[in-house]
Amino acid sequence: MATTNDIKNGTVLKLEGQLWNIIEFQHVKPGKGGAFVRTKMRNVMSGKVVDKTFNAGLKIETATVDRRDYQYLYQDGADFVFMDTSDYDQITVSGATVGDATNFMLENQMVNIAIHEGNPLYIELPPSVVLEITYTEPGLQGDRSSAGTKPATLETGYEIQVPLFVENNTKVKVDTRDGSYLGRVTE
């Protein structure tokens, strides 16, 4: 058993028979009253995000989660096939478990998969990935009714907003947490 003082990003808690992944946490020590821990947690199965506050020092049950590096091989219908790079075992992960990570995954890309009792819980991508723009309209510099961005389709099929100067076949860096454009990549 752990206490709320052990909470950090990535910790998986068992609460009311469900597994919850800590996305954000903040230890708060107010001037009056006892300390507490404010968290934002994602339900591992449903993906629902909730805010929950725990009193400091409260005993909590953590789940043992094994995080391993896997290589994304291919999509098989609604499922995704990954290979463990240490022993070359392949696992199949449902599309629901992969979630929004599909927007940023290319074949042969390395990802981190969290596994609990032999079941994949979620996919962890690097904070940013480099992807190619497959289609975007030409940007007209003087004709602006917005903040100077335009839609662009990535090689994964996901659409992001990019600055007007970005053209087709340009490699860009994309934030995997919110899908935002981070910059052009020069080879």
Swiss-Prot record:
Pathway: Protein biosynthesis; polypeptide chain elongation
Pfam families named in the record: EFP, EFP_N, Elong-fact-P_C
Record gene name: efp
Record-linked CDD domains: S1_EF-P_repeat_1 (cd04470), S1_EF-P_repeat_2 (cd05794)
InterPro entries: Elong-fact-P_C, NA-bd_OB-fold, Rib_uL2_dom2, Transl_elong_fac_P/YeiP, Transl_elong_KOW-like, Transl_elong_P/YeiP_cen, Transl_elongation_fac_P, Translation_prot_SH3-like_sf
SUPFAM superfamilies listed in its UniProt record: Nucleic acid-binding proteins (SSF50249), Translation proteins SH3-like domain (SSF50104)
Keyword Endoplasmic reticulum: no
One Gene Ontology term from the biological process aspect of the record: peptide biosynthetic process
Family designation: Belongs to the elongation factor P family.
Name used for this protein in its record: Elongation factor P
Principal location: cytoplasm
Chain's role: Involved in peptide bond synthesis. Stimulates efficient translation and peptide-bond synthesis on native or reconstituted 70S ribosomes in vitro. Probably functions indirectly by altering the affinity of the ribosome for aminoacyl-tRNA, thus increasing their reactivity as acceptors for peptidyl transferase.
Domain of life assignment: Bacteria
CC annotations in GO: cytoplasm
Keywords, ordered alphabetically: Cytoplasm, Elongation factor, Protein biosynthesis
Molecular function GO labels: translation elongation factor activity
Subcellular compartments: Cytoplasm
